[in-house]
């Protein structure tokens, strides 16, 4: 059926819907009958495919080769255990992959769009997945079209359909009839799922949902979802590939040295195998992904939903946050304070319906307004539903007025024209009602409403109005200007002149209680907070001073002043500009680019359709979850579920903490592996027996190491985390300092391991290997406490991370099980140990931790003395 060829009446009849929309009961029946309004995703890998994919890794292939060599050397028990560990690793990798998919799905559901629909005669907001055929959707600028539909009422609607047609220009829509058969791009009385509303408003009858939409027909092409890796994951992949090559080269050298030392070929091969197993950080990739996933889940619980994992890494580098004022730094709870009308400033309670000026102002406040209050809850823009309260306090309801007076035309609010206008028939005459910024409206007025009626406006009147506007603004109040025009002309932005000035309405939107603390935390963290707002410059600066963004010596500029600046002038002033007022979308992009040119990582917040380009341009685009348009959410890499600036600072702290934990986890794993490598190479150079069986090292790497590594990844943010400067994004994890630390700590553990090996050799090779294995395992378990933080354990507290204690206990229990349970001995090539040997192992294993902690204490005391 071609819905676009049917008249509006025919469409409503076929869908069985009236102007009051579907009933809730009918909508629920249709939802059960036709299913949710979602696109079917492209086929995901099955669990078996994911499992088999684990064996395609180069490092795993090296382990398989090691197992085969072990088998040919006659060590069947070790071969079985190596293969068992490889399979266990594949199972863990599969479980982790499936859990990661589930985590991402839950994050997607948190950021999925809502839709405004008319049901039971009332406008309500519902999740887009619950939209059904026959629903009447209310579309406004900034909305994402969530279903296909026929336009029933059109108010200057413009839509971007590039996702379907490839055409990037906006399409003017209408509610007229089309009789001929036309291509999709010419169906101007229809809207399609996946499109973006860029201007205007419309009521649409839904004709297709889910896979029955135009975009659903090509869903199979769109949903071949490719898994994207973050820069850190890609960096670790490259590191693993390079490591595999280095392992092969060093193993070959060790094999050659062993042969030169007249070692048997199979023994030499076992040396090479031991080295390969020692060097491979089997759990590294999985653990890093787990730590990132835990970080994003924690952020989601704290109202910051990460849409792109790259944002987690970038958050730790943020040096500038460009934030909206309204709702982000303020409470977004608008209440009318004072009203300037008839030349005097009055309270809302003093409005009188018998006064013509007051009555027309109330008309403008209530009729020239798209919001409503249902069951005490405001629906729409907070500024707009605040304007409904004065009429309600007079004992009337906005619907009482709207049911009698019908809107004839409208020009929706636009950030360029900074005003909204509608046409109504009042007292038998057509009137245009308008509201907006004073600089957009006052110059359009040629008359003013007074107690004695309407008269021409004078320059003295304008001076009084501007003076009152400044007084309100200096007190941190948001001010809207109201005017009207009696005319039969068609409503248009270009012809909106000849207005009668009605008055100013000031509203207060107090700063959030936590904003001042959050701004102070940002500054302490080396982050420059910048306020960007569409509000008046004086109002914005007053709020910025209250919360600490604007300091002595700082500058505030308007969008027009910014336009007048050259790039070089902006470059020289940008670090002093703390407030941008009355800005355009182009201004926002220019501000982001100017900061980025100076090498900064920039976060930009936004909620409107016109904010999308700036959100994409910023390193981290942050959309508002409550007031944000679906267009802005689609462009952002992070969505704030509470629209709160303080949540951004929490997310920055969490981003820094995730990166720090990953870095500490990698240090723990690689320093432990370096200890094993040093031990094997040392033994090879001195023609000593192989200090470890391959199965020993696999046991350490996969079982006892994994638990402390995950515990390190769960370390809480330290108190001084926000006292540090933002991380340089160009600086990788494997810095010279990191490498030196890794090698030194690895060498310390290797020394005590080889000491235990020498002592064991006095008995026999099996005892030596067992003592080396036990010492290395226990030393690495102790080492988990060292890698929790750069600070000493005395400063952070032994019990501040209970997971690290549990990980140590579990790892030690696993080691004890292998050492003390006889039937495990042949599987792990374990010799029985005496009580003295076990005591000596415990003492040796603890030495590296004592030394490392002692160094940390000395460094802390030196820093304190400075």
Task: List each model region and its residues.
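Membrane-water interface at loop-to-transmembrane-helix junctions
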Residues: 728-747, 766-767
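Conserved cytosolic headpiece of P-type ATPases
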Residues: 1-723, 733-734, 747, 758, ...
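Alpha-helical scaffolds flanking conserved acidic
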Residues: 361, 767-768
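C-terminal catalytic subdomain
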Residues: 752
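Generic alpha-helical transmembrane segments
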Residues: 704, 749, 770-784
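Long hydrophobic segments that form regular secondary structure
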Residues: 757, 763-764
